[in-house]
Regions:
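Membrane-embedded alpha-helical bundles of polytopic integral membrane proteins
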Residues: 4-150, 154-186
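Acidic (Asp/Glu-rich) catalytic motifs at the cytosolic membrane interface
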Residues: 120-138, 142, 151, 155, ...
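Hydrophobic transmembrane alpha-helices of multi-pass small-molecule transporters
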Residues: 161-162, 230, 239
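A general structural signal for short secondary-structure boundary/capping elements
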Residues: 165, 233-235
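Short, conserved aromatic-histidine micro-motifs
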Residues: 178-181, 224, 243
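Juxtamembrane boundary at the C-terminal end of a transmembrane helix
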Residues: 236-243
Length: 243
């Protein structure tokens, strides 16, 4: 098995484990399987007598941490387990069907509102930053990495993102306004860093698009570069807030 296939298998395992952990079916210690498989991939690559084994290992685990890990955390945004359920649970809607199929003895609360709100804030910030930078942009944010991004764009996108967070707190009452605004601030800061990181990677490699999908728009990864850093940070912050 080549290291690319091994990396894809590891990414699939990471997402699958996090999905079932978020659903309350598996415990967190099952994530140690990822460490065991990572060690196997590391040793296997060293003994394959490739010309650049450490480069291959580094790129594989960079992809795992940079791309696979953020996407594997998304199930935690939509599923929470609320303890044991005594007696049969009536099946009435899609959420009840999910409870019954995944784990009948636990009540799994399935709500896409937090994840939907996260993406809405991210998209509003991205769009607002682009339009503000195009209309009013003068001061470059980081000319060496991304010459088109400006401070005016960041400011315009930030204002729209915070306003969106306030509106979301009125529509999605389960999450308070302070939480939504904090999520928006984390998206603004780490989303911008994620955007700059992806731009820097493309410049170092010497490519215009990150993939063959969506040519001319920076590639498929450009549509998600902002969330790659913001998802782990928002997830971590929410975990501390819920304790």
């Amino acid at each position: 098995m080549c290291i690319r296939d091994s990396g894809l298998s590891l990414a699939t395992l990471l997402y699958t484990l996090n999905f079932f952990i978020a659903a309350g079916i598996l415990r967190v210690h099952y994530l140690t399987l990822v460490l065991v498989l990572s060690l196997f991939i590391y040793i296997n690559e060293l003994f394959l007598q490739n010309n650049r084994p450490f480069h291959n290992i580094a790129y594989t685990f960079l992809g795992l941490i940079y791309i696979a890990l953020p996407f594997s955390l998304l199930p935690y945004f939509v599923m929470t387990v609320s303890g044991d359920v005594s007696g049969p649970v009536p099946i009435e809607g899609s959420e009840d069907i999910l409870n019954y199929l995944l784990q009948p003895e636990h009540l799994i609360r399935f709500s896409p509102m937090l994840l939907l709100g996260f993406f809405i804030i991210h998209w509003i910030y991205d769009t607002g930053a682009y339009l503000s930078g195009r209309w009013f942009g003068k001061r470059k944010l980081f000319r060496r990495i991304s010459p088109k991004k400006t401070w005016e764009g960041v400011l315009g996108g930030s204002l729209l993102a915070v306003m969106t967070a306030v509106l979301l707190s009125r529509w999605f009452h389960q999450t308070g306004m302070i939480t939504w605004v904090m999520i928006a601030l984390l998206i603004i800061f780490f989303g911008t860093l994620g955007d700059l990181t992806e731009s820097m990677l493309k410049r170092k490699i010497g490519v215009k698009d990150s993939g063959k999908l969506l040519p001319g728009h920076g590639g498929f990864l450009d549509r998600f570069d902002g969330i790659l850093l913001s998802v782990p940070v928002v997830f971590t912050w929410l975990q501390f807030m819920m304790r």
